[in-house]
Amino acid sequence: MNSIEFPLLDRTTPISVISTTSNDLSNWSRLSSLWPLLYGTSCCFIEFASLIGSRFDFDRYGLVPRSSPRQADLILTAGTVTMKMAPSLVRLYEQMPEQKYVIAMGACTITGGMFSTDSYSTVRGVDKLIPVDVYLPGCPPKPEAIIDAITKLRKKISREIYEDRIRSQQGNRCFTTNHKFHIGRTTNTGNYDQGLLYQPPSTSKIAPEAFFKYKKSVSSPELVN
């Protein structure tokens, strides 16, 4: 495991008094006691079972899983995020106290994964909803990769300046947006439907009921204009 940068010592005295800055001391205390909120929706989340065991034992890094976002300062998102779950994820993030961090784990969380090509309900990347500090690719990532991602996050925290992070968060607010269609193949014919174009949220006029239209001659729903 990579070494972590601890607070820089300004000076020491013969009576064992250490002098440092409040910012460095705060960073060191936070990186040594990260309390994660585990947000798992599919198979990537199963890898956390290996971390809990004695072989990896992520408790030794000061990680204490919490069930409440108000007690957590790190949220680990693993698995596919759907449009129905997006408001709940944003609400959990907003309920976390400052300073708070996000690790996006797995291809489905980062880009939508294999569901991003023809699924109307999949969010193409969790960073469209909340700011992400560390991206962890893989399908699924190994437990060693998860530990490495946590190590990189701890290094990032050790070099952090509190005022800069607050200023960045004030200028980049997160919010939910409706996800729109790309041009895709219909369910039955395999032909491209030119009516379902990808448009910005402000200009899209496609009504939700127009996405699926049932016909008596079709056994399954078909995308129509």
From Swiss-Prot:
Binding locations of [4Fe-4S] cluster: 43-44, 108, 139
Pfam families to which the protein is assigned, alphabetical: Oxidored_q6 (PF01058)
Membrane topology: Peripheral membrane protein
Biological process terms in GO annotation: aerobic respiration; electron transport coupled proton transport; photosynthesis, light reaction
GO MF term list: 4 iron, 4 sulfur cluster binding; iron ion binding; NADH dehydrogenase (ubiquinone) activity; quinone binding
Catalytic activity field: a plastoquinone + NADH + (n+1) H(+)(in) = a plastoquinol + NAD(+) + n H(+)(out); a plastoquinone + NADPH + (n+1) H(+)(in) = a plastoquinol + NADP(+) + n H(+)(out)
InterPro entries (alphabetical): NADH_UbQ_OxRdtase-like_20kDa, NADH_UQ_OxRdtase_20Kd_su
Needed cofactors: [4Fe-4S] cluster
Coiled-coil regions listed: none
Keywords for this protein: 4Fe-4S, Chloroplast, Iron, Iron-sulfur, Membrane, Metal-binding, NAD, NADP, Plastid, Plastoquinone, Quinone, Thylakoid, Translocase, Transport
The keyword Metal-binding belongs to this UniProt entry's keyword annotation: yes
Cofactor: how and how many bound: Binds 1 [4Fe-4S] cluster.
Subcellular location: Plastid, Chloroplast thylakoid membrane
Family: Belongs to the complex I 20 kDa subunit family.
Subunit text: NDH is composed of at least 16 different subunits, 5 of which are encoded in the nucleus.
Protein's name according to its UniProt entry: NAD(P)H-quinone oxidoreductase subunit K, chloroplastic
Record organism: Populus trichocarpa
Lineage: Eukaryota, Viridiplantae, Streptophyta, Embryophyta, Tracheophyta
